[in-house]
Amino acid sequence: MKMINKLIVPVTASALLLGACGASATDSKENTLISSKAGDVTVADTMKKIGKDQIANASFTEMLNKILADKYKNKVNDKKIDEQIEKMQKQYGGKDKFEKALQQQGLTADKYKENLRTAAYHKELLSDKIKISDSEIKEDSKKASHILIKVKSKKSDKEGLDDKEAKQKAEEIQKEVSKDPSKFGEIAKKESMDTGSAKKDGELGYVLKGQTDKDFEKALFKLKDGEVSDVVKSSFGYHIIKADKPTDFNSEKQSLKEKLVDQKVQKNPKLLTDAYKDLLKEYDVDFKDRDIKSVVEDKILNPEKLKQGGAQGGQSGMSQ
C-alpha cells in the first residue's frame, strides 16, 4: 500500500506511555516510570523528550491496527501471506538470506509477517470504501509489449544510440514487425534494449493510465488488441508498442483493482483519511489525551498534510 507508510509506522514503546497518561501527565508517584536518589523519571518527562507527534503517531497506529484486525481478520487469508513470504525467500536466495536481509532492516520474520497482514487489512478497508468496476479497470489498463531502442542522454553513455541512429533503427524494426506481427516477441528478444522485458518477448504486463511516459501511454491506449504501433518517441527512446490481448484479465483483475485504488488515494488522500475517520466513529474511539487528539486530527487525519508529505512505501519494510 502506497500511502499507508506515512501513517503506519512501527509501534514503539512510547505508545505504552499513553496508558499511564490519563487526561494529562503529571509528576505524581503513579506517573513515575523510574525512581532514584537523584530524582524520578516521569511520564511527563519522557513524553517531552520523545515528542507528542511521535507518541500520537505510535498510539494512533496501535489503535488503528487493533480496529483493522477486529474488522477484517476473517477476510485476510494467512495462507496467501505465507505464499508472499515464500516468494520473497526465493527472490533472496533462500530463507536464511531473506531473514538476514530482514535483520538488516531491524525486522524479524514474525514482524514482517505481521506487517504484511496489516497491509492486507488496509487493502480490505480501501476496497470497502473505494468502489471500482470491471469496466473502469478495463478502461484504465492495457496489456502491452514493446521494443525499445534507447537514446543516449550524453555521448559518454555506454547504452543506447544517438537520437538519429536510434530513430532509424526503430523504424527498420517497425517495418520488420509489420511484415509479420506474430514474430514480435522473437524480434523483441533480439533487438529491444529494455533487457528486463526483452527476456519475456517484450512483455510489460498491464500498464495503467498515469503509470508511465505520457507519449508511450497515449500511443498504447489508442491501439486495439493485437495492433502494433508506429515508432513512438518517449523520454526513454524509441518504441514499437504492441497491445496484447488481455486473455488473463480475470486472474489479474484484483491486482489491477488494488493498484487503481492506490492511484486514487495518492491523487486524493482524503479518501484514506475519510476511511480512517469512519473507522474511529464505528468503533467509538475516544482520545483521553487532548494533545494526542490534536496531533491526530490536525496532522494524521488531515489530507492536506498527508499530501504535502508525499506517498510512501508499504508497511512490510521490504519490496515485493
From Swiss-Prot:
It is found in: Cell membrane. One of its GO terms (biological process) is protein folding. GO terms for cellular component: plasma membrane. The keyword Protein biosynthesis does not apply. A lipid is attached at C21 (N-palmitoyl cysteine). It is a lipid-anchor. Its main location: membrane. Keywords: Cell membrane, Isomerase, Lipoprotein, Membrane, Palmitate, Rotamase, Signal. It catalyses: [protein]-peptidylproline (omega=180) = [protein]-peptidylproline (omega=0). The keyword Lipoprotein applies. PROSITE patterns: PPIC_PPIASE_2, PROKAR_LIPOPROTEIN. A lipid is attached at C21 (S-diacylglycerol cysteine). Residues 139-245 form the PpiC domain. Its EC number is 5.2.1.8. Residues 159-198 are annotated as: Disordered. HAMAP family: Foldase_PrsA. PANTHER family: FOLDASE PROTEIN PRSA, PEPTIDYLPROLYL ISOMERASE. Plays a major role in protein secretion by helping the post-translocational extracellular folding of several secreted proteins. Belongs to the PrsA family. This is Foldase protein PrsA. It comes from Staphylococcus aureus (strain bovine RF122 / ET3-1). The lineage of its organism: Bacteria, Bacillati, Bacillota, Bacilli, Bacillales. The gene is prsA.
